[in-house]
Amino acid sequence: VALRKDIWRPAIVMATAEAIVARGSIQGFPLMWLPPMGSFQFLADPFGLWRDGRLYVFVETYDYRVRIGAIEVLVYDADFRLVDRQPVLNEAWHLSYPLVFEAEGETWMLPEAHRSNRLTLYRAVDFPTRWEPAQIIELDHVAVDATPVFHGGRWWLFYTSADREPDKMSALHVAYADRLAGPWTPHPMNPVRVDVASARPGGMPLVIDGRIVLPVQDCSRTYGGAIRPLTMTVLTPDRFEAEVGDAMVPPASSAPFVEGLHTLSTAGPVTLVDMKRTELSLHGLSIEAVREAKKLRPKRRASVRG
């Protein structure tokens, strides 16, 4: 059990994602925090959609005592006042990374749910609070943080593999399809990138100068330590090349949330991010104390039978 627990807090940055990528930092841009949570609870993984002058921010909500993430929506008016907050999706398994987007005349959510051993695409039945499973996306691996984008006349899907714990952070895969529902074809070069500092998706893709720019997590120092822009310089059904930019870390002004930044989601004129601090876990400490006490106990001498 970890002695310290990650506590994330999302914020709305008053700048476009393109401006943030160009600057290489959120430093200097005004930001507004989402509401705080209670002890050992957090919100994370913000994704947003504007509709009728309102910003709908979808987030993971997590409580360390329950240990299963669920999805909520926070609704902001044009002046960024919080006007509503509702639960939107709960399953028997952990949910996070509620990537919401509009395509093919519908509103979709593709949440991270690798503990269900499948990737489920949800369709909004009554936006923003009611969603139904619409499609199981079949891939070469159980996907982590699957992130779709339509570009160059086809769909692309970026994800890491849930096969092994290190792969979740470091093994980037790609698949492509003509339609969102598939069928999806895994890229022949998978994993197209193996690097703990620039593989796991961390937000909504951008298209800058005709190239896909995928926010990816730098987990080299700590989980979700920073975001880097990964620019696809060559992306075809049989080729993949990419260049990675510098790490974007929390500014000092976001203290105490300065220990990680692992989402960068474009939302029109603003950008959604989340930053972390860590909190000392008494439960973790108590387990560690018991473990140390056992080490100090004198070992019994084995009895010898004659």
What are these regions (language model features)?
Residues 1-306:
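Carbohydrate-active catalytic/glycan-binding domains of CAZyme proteins
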